[in-house]
């Protein structure tokens, strides 16, 4: 409804002469004088009015249609945009390598007319026999290598369900050349790698090698790592030179604790059939020595038992001959008594012979059973119980020589040693201890194990309590406060050789 007071107030404030325009503005602003006045002066701002050629400053009043359009524009100014549509995409693409990896140096314009195949043949002809032999001696293991980019290698390993064995080499390091000459050339190691790994060897100066050393930080060459092709995770790594035997043992221990399918084959059970039983493989020289001592003691006891069984029989025969001689010197009246005594002695000797033969047969059967048990048992050498005294009407004491006595003492010392813990049998570090007698102990420890664990292992294996351990070069005495240090703190991981000095 029109309010004449509000209209007249608006006209007096604004100085507008058109009452219809004022009514329209008031209606659009709900008859609010302040808002209507602001709207009027905003519309008639002199800065928005274009200058005219006339000398008089006149402004044509806006029409009702223009005012209504502008007001509608103000009310519909707040518009909302459409929502962003959903889409599926990869956070990191499979081929995430930078473009620099595929960059190749531009060839010279003069090299376009060169025949590289012909030049290669000329250079090979000029090479001496020594150069050819050296190149063949230090050449990489091409028969087990897999060529391609790291992504291609991972795809191939994932299809074969193998782990990736990576070897990063540096031409300036001689240990890398030794690795090709001594380690990768081993036939047994080649078979192990070819059946369980995809082997990838690359130079550190190669673009692929540079990219690998950036993703997996490498500070020393040669560098060996085992990669899971599914996730790209580095499972294990090592640096420096390693011989073929230690490398094979390193890979076998890795395969025994890791499986591509996640299921590790359990060790063979002891309840398997007799045909499938195999002799235990002794890894250390001490275990082989213990087995040899036990077998030698068995053989000597068998010989002594046989010699002991003949001695009482000879005594019985001597007694029989003496009795026969005495009977011959007697009168004819005592002939009946002599014949009776001879028959009784003969029957006793036959009984003794029968019992001795039965005992020998039982002992042979026991020896066969104990040998089978030695092959089955993995941790202990069973005790052989043989009776040194046999009863043949009288007790015969077996005399033991000095050498046999020493062997018995060694056996008793070995039997007293019982390893109640797993120290020296598991871990990621291989520690070798050279004993004064020329023997070498080899044990597996963890990098966080202390030096006193090695002392305990050596004491259990050798039975010696007063000794010291020290490194070769630089010479370091591992005693005192250093016994509480770990292998990692003393830089003895993942492998080290220690010397033993008996006090």
From Swiss-Prot:
SMART domains: UAS, UBX
Record PROSITE patterns: UBX (PS50033), UIM (PS50330)
Region annotation Disordered: where it falls in the sequence: 47-80, 262-284, 299-389
GO molecular function annotations of the record: ubiquitin binding
Pfam families, alphabetized: Thioredoxin_7 (PF13899), UBA_4 (PF14555), UBX (PF00789)
InterPro entries to which the protein is assigned, alphabetical: Thioredoxin-like_sf, UAS, UBA-like_sf, Ubiquitin-like_domsf, UBX_7/2, UBX_dom, UBX_domain-protein, UIM_dom
Protein name per UniProt: UBX domain-containing protein 7 homolog
